[in-house]
């Protein structure tokens, strides 16, 4: 989450990280990011939404991510609340897939962390065609397509992502 927040800040998109982990807080602050030591599920969570327009839940806890999305869905709307897929959602194909899943149907916390450790910086790729975009979205064993930035707008990629190259 720190590398994503750092990328967004670099492109003038304000972020605030919420965490209780002293190590995560220290790492975020050393990267120059705004971070709050606070439980996002606490009752005073509504005060945290004053300047926010999206929630991206990227904790190692599936339960925290799911509950945070449920809590903030009514505030931000279902198009602005995202979380990682759970291992059970990957394994049990019979489960209906929620639409708030980030990145892809198989990008869980473990895959995200393994790729971030291997490649700590986000790589920006210029898209020059529809075919190139589809290939990037569909062939992602060694990377996770995270977002599309066009001018001053950022779209996070989720399982129901539809974007047409223009």
Predicted ranges, named:
Residues 1-166:
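Cytosolic regulatory regions of ion transport systems
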């Amino acid at each position: 989450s720190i590398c994503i927040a750092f990328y967004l800040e670099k492109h003038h998109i304000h972020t605030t990280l919420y965490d209780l982990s002293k190590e995560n807080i220290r790492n975020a602050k050393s990267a120059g990011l705004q971070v709050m030591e606070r439980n996002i599920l606490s009752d005073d969570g509504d005060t945290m939404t004053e300047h926010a327009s999206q929630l991206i839940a990227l904790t190692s806890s599936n339960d925290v991510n799911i509950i945070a999305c449920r809590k903030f869905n009514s505030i931000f709307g279902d198009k602005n609340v995202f979380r990682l897929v759970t291992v059970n959602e990957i394994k049990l194909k019979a489960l209906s897939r929620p639409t708030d899943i980030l990145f892809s149907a198989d990008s869980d916390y473990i895959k995200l962390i393994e790729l971030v450790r291997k490649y700590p910086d986000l790589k920006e790729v210029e898209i020059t065609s529809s075919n190139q975009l589809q290939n990037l979205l569909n062939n992602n064993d060694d990377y996770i397509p995270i977002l599309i930035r066009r001018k001053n707008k950022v779209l996070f990629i989720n399982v129901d992502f539809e974007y047409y190259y223009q």
